[in-house]
Amino acid sequence: MGVKNYLIEGVSCTGKTSVCDELRRRGYHSINGDRDLAYWGDPKTGEPLDGSAYEHHTWIWDVDKVRALVADQSHAASFFCGGSRNFDRFIDLFDGVFVLEVDLDTLNRRLAARPEDEWGDHVVGDHGRASEREFIARLHATKEDIPKNAITIDATAPLSRVVDAILGNANLVSP
């Protein structure tokens, strides 16, 4: 959707949705991947899964939709914000990749403040919210499901500074 396309990733609670909203507020074309592109599917084939197979690694983006949006160059820049476990199937389409990162205390504080319906037990199976938090803390520590060789953005900073850092690294200024 842009002449330049950027991916903004990170583990849960790093601020991907907030960044997307702030980019939109500033006039940038931004896609909330978790709302507009994601579904539960097989990461290799893209086939949708039934409710019994919902696991963290099956939260994927529709690769054909991503390719179509990237091919549409009606915007000077587009930002794709969200988590996808099949990013390896389309990451090469992006001009830049940013990973939002927070410290463990910030992560735990944001997790505790999340609404009950923000994400369900299906994220890691039927083990409850405590297991979800442990799982997210493990992902935070291992960085096992986020893009490598990305530009790391300190997302503990105020939102305006986080977005300024992304725009600066993309050599963009607010429209």
Model region roles, listed by residue range:
Residues G15:
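Conserved glycine(s) of the Walker
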Residues A53-E101:
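Glycine-rich phosphate-binding loop used to anchor ATP phosphates in small-molecule kinases
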Residues S18:
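Conserved Walker
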Residues G10:
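The Walker A (P-loop) glycine that initiates the GxxxxGKT/S ATP-binding motif of P-loop NTPases
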Residues F87, A113-G168, V173-P175:
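Small-molecule kinase domains that catalyze NTP-dependent phosphoryl transfer to phosphate-bearing small molecules
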